[in-house]
UniProtKB/Swiss-Prot annotation:
Family to which this protein belongs: Belongs to the Gfa family.
The enzyme's E.C. designation: 4.4.1.22
GO biological process: formaldehyde catabolic process
Cofactor note: Binds 2 Zn(2+) ions per subunit.
Entry keyword set: Lyase, Metal-binding, Plasmid, Zinc
Protein's pathway: One-carbon metabolism; formaldehyde degradation; formate from formaldehyde (glutathione route): step 1/3
Official protein name in the record: Glutathione-dependent formaldehyde-activating enzyme
Pfam families given in the database record: GFA
Function field: Catalyzes the condensation of formaldehyde and glutathione to S-hydroxymethylglutathione.
Gene designation: gfa
Catalysed transformations (reactions): S-(hydroxymethyl)glutathione = glutathione + formaldehyde
SUPFAM superfamilies membership: Mss4-like (SSF51316)
Length: 189
């Protein structure tokens, strides 16, 4: 069987009704960074971009969003560093193990400002929103995946119920376009 990501390869459970979040933990055996997520996540997806953190051997990352006011570093804050200060999403990673703990957009004019990006697979709790789609699928080629494998990869994503896109899902692309249209005056604010 084609391996995409350990949290999606064998299917995934549905979200638990009333699930209110949990704690993410980096891969350090001692003194791990922990981040409390205070609510359910949304727009969970497999991501093929080369910026997102992936566990060892994974082709895709698994990433979801949550309101930034629901993200709280509870231990190890001194170990966090921004991976690429020039990136739109400031990805905070543990400097010891390299695990990305959360990503934050600081540009208040960005359509996704106020949402943080998190890897729910770093939590021991169950009940998180499941992945809904696969984004930036073609980008896995940039990380070394053979382009000839793409039809098989897209077929496997589809088999898992994850519609493959080479951008974000249509509702997220609509949200971006709506935000821009309101900023430019093409739509009322």
């Amino acid at each position: 069987m084609l391996k995409l990501h350990p949290s999606i390869d064998n299917g995934f459970p549905p979200a638990s009704p009333g699930f209110a979040g949990g704690t993410l933990k980096c891969k350090c055996a001692s003194n791990p960074v922990t981040v409390r997520i205070g609510s359910q996540t949304a727009h969970n997806h497999a991501c093929g971009c080369t910026k997102c953190w992936k566990p060892e051997g994974a082709i895709f990352a698994q990433i979801a969003v949550v309101g930034r006011d629901n993200v709280n570093v509870t231990s190890g804050a001194e170990k966090l560093q921004v991976v690429d200060p020039s990136a739109t999403i400031q990805r905070y990673a543990c400097r010891d193990c390299g695990t990305h703990m959360y990503g934050r957009i600081e540009n208040t004019k960005h359509p996704f400002y106020g949402l943080d990006f998190v890897h729910t697979e770093l939590s021991d709790e169950t009940g998180w929103s499941p992945p809904e789609f696969a984004a930036f699928v073609s980008s896995i080629i940039e990380s070394g995946v053979n382009p000839e494998s793409m039809p098989e990869i897209r077929a496997r994503l589809t088999e898992l119920g994850l519609q493959p896109y080479d951008c974000l899902s249509p509702p997220l692309m609509d949200a971006i376009a709506t935000h821009i249209a309101k900023q430019t005056g093409a739509l009322p604010a």
